[in-house]
Amino acid sequence: EGFKKRDYLYNYDNAIEKAQETKCIFLVEGQGDVWKLYEAGVKNAVGLFGKDISKKQRSLLLKSGVTKLIVLTDNDQAGRESKIKIKRDMSRLFKLVFPSMHTKDLGNMFIDKLKEEILDDLKGCF
């Protein structure tokens, strides 16, 4: 059977304390994106293991007690589709923030650019 990625959010157990403190979670597609945010000082990032959010992942987010999701999916077709689905499925449950990103993948950004272009506007969320 193997690992059921749809039942988990990558880094959830490590992110939950800071997420509950700030009432925010950074939602990204992959593990590399979580690592990049961690390098930049963000301790409350979780990864979807892809572009789609499952019912089980949504339940984990609801159970966390956060009120705001910072959605940073990739800047490609799949990432744009993911944003549309997240907006449709989650907008009644959370305040959603979709920071604009000028690169395809968060994991490829330099830390200083990530801080300047995205994180500077999100003080108090991490």
Regions picked out by a protein language model, each given a short descriptive name:
Residues E81-S91:
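Short, aromatic/basic amphipathic alpha-helical patches
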Residues E1-S64, S82-K83:
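Phosphate-handling DNA/RNA-contact segment within nucleic-acid enzymes
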Residues N44, T67-K68, L93:
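Residues at the starts of beta-strands that form the adenosine-phosphate
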Residues L27, S64-A78:
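Acidic beta-strand-to-loop metal/phosphate-binding motif
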Residues G79-E81, K104-G107:
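Switch/connector loops and helix/strand junctions flanking conserved nucleotide-binding motifs
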Residues E17, G107-F126:
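Short, small/acidic-rich helices and loops at N termini and domain boundaries
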